[in-house]
Amino acid sequence: MIENLLSKFSYDMWVALTILAGLLAWAFAKGRKDPRSKKAPTSREQRGTTQRPSGESPHEETDSSPKKKPRAIQKGSADEFTSAKRDIVASRETSDPFRPRIKGPHSDLSSSVEAQLLAPGMVYALAYGDFLNSFGLSNSRGITKMLKRDWDITDRSTLLRQIYSMLRDGHRSYYNDLRKKALDLAASQTRVNPGFPKSHWRELSRFINDERGLQTTNFTAWDLMRAANLTRAGEGLGWMTRDEAEDTLALINHGLRTTYSSWEEACDAFIVTRWLWLNEEGEAMEASDLHDQRRREALVGPNGVWNKIPWDGTYPSPRYLLLDASDENFQLNPMSRFEWEDAPRWERELDDESHKRIQERNER
């Protein structure tokens, strides 16, 4: 009897184990076929490994994989210019993303002081879908997120610090140094180490081969137009007063007009520097080129907005209110003697005003 029970128990166990094994195999096979069981893609997988500005996406991080941003710019910082590149971009009207939005008659642009002041930031206001000739933001929430994500700007202090940093030396200082190194490298016929990063070599070779006129490009427009965009954003978010924003834009206009001879020249300098900064090749570069070609058409083409704004138009003289705010928000960084010798007029004037404020504070 005991033997019969053991035999029946063994048989029942064998049947149960067989059924269990079958169920496990079925569940495993179903899990592999069921798309709902797949791991949800990361945001990077959803966007693709590299974002390209076919129309400038809301999250265009271009070459960045980790979240590294151009904080208050530190001159010569390697990671800032290799993995911390940021172009401030935003979504726009999907029907025609390059259709300028103008408040009031277009004929008023030629005499509008506000349009004159806002003009340098129009390269980005065009992308945001904002009115080009009027203060204000069409997507304050999106701008706030972008500033935090791409610039580490979260308040008045971090905003003013970054604007001052771009006015002080920005990326142009780095690119001027890189150009000199590239040309020295070519002149000495130095052999490049095989392990030298491809992206670095691409930058150097573009200078050496004078691609797109890099050997004579003035990179100032890249810094000033981005600073204008941050200024407009700061005013729209309440981190700068209207008076501070207008005065900072007056300084930016002064810098552009004492550096270039026309809107077209300034626009081309911005686009070439942006191309250098993106450091792309192949299809990605072609997509970016198409984007900037359309941007250029909207600004300086036959019906471009900048053509309606006189290059030699009147705008207020800068009072350097940004520097007045430095006491509570950031530290002034005067030029060295060597920097002064090579600096353009508008940068020397900015430096003079910085020294005045430093002296006043020391005398308190």
Residue ranges and their predicted role:
Residues M1-F9:
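Short, strongly hydrophobic alpha-helical membrane anchors
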Residues Y11-T18, G22-N229, A233-E235, W239-R242, ...:
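Polar/charged low-complexity regulatory segments
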